[in-house]
Amino acid sequence: MYLEHWNLNHLPFENVPNPAFYYPSPTHEEALERLKYAVYCGKGAAMITGGVGCGKTILSRALINRLEKERYHVAAMTNPLLAPVAFLHSVMCSFKESHNHAPPKAKLWNELEGRLKRNMGRGNGSVLIIDEAQAITDRRTLEELRMLLNLQTDDKFMLTLILLGQLELEHLVEGVEPLKQRIAIKYRLNHLSMQDVDSYVGHRLRIAGSNQSPFSDEALEAIYACTQGIPRDINNLCDRSLLSAYLENIERVDKAVVDEAWQDLL
């Protein structure tokens, strides 16, 4: 454990979606603003795509943190690879409507619509976030997504559907025209720039308790060159670099340490 060596209170580069470590890069903030717009203005559906490790999941956690808990009921699904009835049952459970066994599909739809109407009657919005949505390969389940967006009153959608996924999700949605037409907000996350990487690393270190970054400027440039600005890869490389420097009792992480750590990760 290298925490004491680097004067840290927490591990700074864990690849878990802890919203406390969310870094407001320009691309993530634009995505977040688009999602907030979709929720606040009742746009029905929004889709955020990006490569593996670009920060989609932590973005969803940041969104949940920024939505007023008194105004919005948020359900999050991380395993959408389900057949239609199991999918609807999972949606109901995500909205805290539990069943020991999945009831018939028609009953699920009636109960879901009833839950959404009750939320609206209390002045609450309903938000369904589906992570790893590119995993939905059953066309029947995609049809259920479209049907969710048919749940409307005369002037608004009963819920906001947010799809997060890898780039394949864009092609998946393209092949389902009725669903594609209902997605009002779309955005693709970009990689972090060199400047962002510098700020990202410093941000995570500060959240973890550091007063000063142990990475040299050349080390940060090497981190960017190796990872191409992909947050998950940055986390892995920084963590390994801090560990390597600690094991060698080095007080400063330089380019040589980063290069060696990157080779260990390949």
Predicted segments, located by residue:
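C-terminal alpha-helical "lid" subdomain
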Residues: H101, R122, V127, M158, ...
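Short regulatory helix/loop adjacent to the ATP-binding pocket of P-loop NTPases
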Residues: L63-L67, L167-A184
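Conserved NTP-binding/hydrolysis module of P-loop NTPases
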Residues: L8-F13, R71-Y72, L82-H101
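Conserved catalytic segments around the Walker B and adjacent sensor/switch elements
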Residues: A46, K69-P80
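A short, basic N-terminal segment
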Residues: M1-G42, D259, Q263
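Conserved AAA+ ATPase core "coupling" helix
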Residues: A83-S90, G175-R206
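Mid-core helix/loop region of P-loop NTP-binding domains shared across ATPases and GTPases
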Residues: L3, A83-A86, H99-I130, Q134-E144, ...
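Walker A/P-loop nucleotide-binding motif
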Residues: C41-L63
